[in-house]
Structures are given as C-alpha cells and as structure tokens.
C-alpha cells in the first residue's frame, strides 16, 4: 500500500495540471508606469493579455523581459483559478535578456470566463508560477 501511495504521489506531481490555492490579481499601475505582470529572479513577464480570436476562441499574447535558467514555459488554462491545465508548451534552450513575445490561441475554451497562468520549469528541476489572468468573453 505504501508503494502505491508513493507512485500515486509521483504521478500527481508530474501531471500537466496544477491546483492553485490562491488567485492573485495583478496590480495595475494607475499612472501607466512600466509595471510588470510578474517578476522573480528567473522570469519577468512584461505583459499578458487575452482577447477573443473568433466566435469561440481566445488569443493569449504574452511577452517576457528575461528568462533565466528556464527549460520550459507552459501556458495553463482553466475554468477556475484553482485548477489549470497546460494548453501550450515552449521548450527553451538558452537564457534570454531581450523582450520575447509569444502568442497562443485556445480554439475551444471550456467556459465564457477563463483563467490563464504561466508555469515554468528550471534547469535544476524546480518550477514556478506567475499570477493568474482572468478573461471574460464579451468584455
């Protein structure tokens, strides 16, 4: 039984979905200064924006100012901010210190209100998450 529980725990840890306990609303700078959506020592997300791409799809544009020691970026999506699954993966091979832009289209979102987040994996095996972006269709 102990071995089964260990295997189950490993399977959960390596799944492409992630449970978030908190929704963090990004701070909005009212005076328009250069405030980042997310920043830590490994990643700086300059902006992330979701918009309607057609009658059903959602286009997510995001840009990074730097990427350090990161092997993989994953855009995650979900109907709630607490349970998100990977919808797009970018495998990275080198550090970046210049603005990089990414664009992903989620052709069939599950709900009219969707939540998006970037998860990243580091070379040492650690990982991190950005803040969560809420998108409401029709707004």
Question: Locations of the language-model features?
Answer:
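Pro/Thr/Ser/Gly-rich low-complexity, intrinsically disordered linker/stalk tracts
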Residues: 23-68, 131-139
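Recognizes extended acidic, P/S/T-rich segments that occur
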Residues: 72-111
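Bacterial signal peptide processing site
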Residues: 18-20
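Short coil/turn motifs at secondary-structure junctions
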Residues: 67, 80, 123-125
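Beta-strand-rich modules
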Residues: 106-126
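C-terminal motif of bacterial Sec signal peptides marking the signal peptidase cleavage site
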Residues: 14-16
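Sec-dependent signal peptide recognition
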Residues: 2-10
């Amino acid at each position: 039984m102990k071995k089964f529980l260990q295997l189950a725990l490993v399977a959960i840890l390596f799944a492409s979905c992630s449970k978030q306990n908190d929704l963090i609303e990004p701070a909005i700078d009212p005076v328009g200064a250069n405030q980042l959506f997310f920043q830590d020592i490994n990643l700086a997300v300059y902006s992330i924006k979701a918009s309607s791409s057609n009658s059903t799809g959602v286009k997510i544009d995001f840009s990074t100012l730097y990427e350090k020691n990161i092997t993989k970026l994953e855009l995650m999506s979900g109907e709630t901010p607490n349970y998100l699954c990977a919808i797009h993966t970018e495998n990275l091979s080198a550090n970046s210190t210049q603005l990089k832009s990414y664009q992903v289209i989620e052709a069939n979102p599950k709900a009219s209100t969707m939540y998006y987040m970037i998860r990243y994996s580091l070379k040492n095996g650690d990982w991190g998450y950005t803040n969560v972006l809420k998108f409401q269709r029709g707004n």
